[in-house]
């Protein structure tokens, strides 16, 4: 015979009005916060990734791929100039 964990059944939670009042506000707020985080460029600044227009500069149009694993430092220095 299975014992009870003392928690509310999942069906009771998702059919309650309180659940939907809380989540009707928080889910759209999280979506909006994420959209603002990315669209303002703050995500690029925090994580240090280049913006889409910064991948290729006017001087360097080739792909920055390291192909020689034994001389990787020299290649990285050449690619980042």
Curated annotation (Swiss-Prot):
Return the cofactor note field: With its partner (PsbF) binds heme. PSII binds additional chlorophylls, carotenoids and specific lipids.
Where it sits in the cell: the answer is: Cellular thylakoid membrane
For this protein, the record's PROSITE patterns field holds: CYTOCHROME_B559
Recorded coiled-coil stretches: none
* Membrane topology per record: Single-pass membrane protein
Which cofactor does this sequence's record say it needs?
heme b
Q: Name one GO cellular component term.
A: photosystem II reaction center
Q: Name one GO molecular function term.
A: iron ion binding
GO annotation, biological process: photosynthetic electron transport chain
Specify which residues bind heme according to the UniProt entry for this protein. 23
Source domain of life is Bacteria
Q: Which residues form the signal peptide?
A: none
Membrane-spanning segments: 21-35
| Family annotation (Pfam families) | Cytochrom_B559, Cytochrom_B559a
- Principal location listed in the UniProt entry: membrane
Keyword annotations from UniProtKB, A to Z: Electron transport, Heme, Iron, Membrane, Metal-binding, Photosynthesis, Photosystem II, Thylakoid, Transmembrane, Transmembrane helix, Transport
User: Which family does the entry's similarity section mention?
Assistant: Belongs to the PsbE/PsbF family.
What interactions and quaternary structure are annotated? Heterodimer of an alpha subunit and a beta subunit. PSII is composed of 1 copy each of membrane proteins PsbA, PsbB, PsbC, PsbD, PsbE, PsbF, PsbH, PsbI, PsbJ, PsbK, PsbL, PsbM, PsbT, PsbX, PsbY, PsbZ, Psb30/Ycf12, peripheral proteins PsbO, CyanoQ (PsbQ), PsbU, PsbV and a large number of cofactors. It forms dimeric complexes.
What does the function comment of this entry state?
A: This b-type cytochrome is tightly associated with the reaction center of photosystem II (PSII). PSII is a light-driven water:plastoquinone oxidoreductase that uses light energy to abstract electrons from H(2)O, generating O(2) and a proton gradient subsequently used for ATP formation. It consists of a core antenna complex that captures photons, and an electron transfer chain that converts photonic excitation into a charge separation.
Query: What is the protein's given name?
Result: Cytochrome b559 subunit alpha
Which organism is the protein's source?
Answer: Synechococcus sp. (strain JA-2-3B'a(2-13))
Point out the gene that encodes the protein. Answer: psbE
């Amino acid at each position: 015979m299975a014992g009870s964990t003392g928690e509310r059944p999942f069906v009771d939670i998702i059919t309650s009005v309180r659940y939907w009042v809380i989540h009707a506000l928080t889910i759209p707020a999280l979506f909006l916060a994420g959209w603002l985080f990315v669209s303002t460029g703050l995500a690029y600044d925090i994580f240090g990734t280049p913006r889409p227009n910064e991948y290729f500069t006017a001087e360097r149009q080739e792909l920055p791929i390291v192909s020689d694993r034994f001389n990787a430092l020299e290649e990285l220095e050449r690619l980042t100039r």
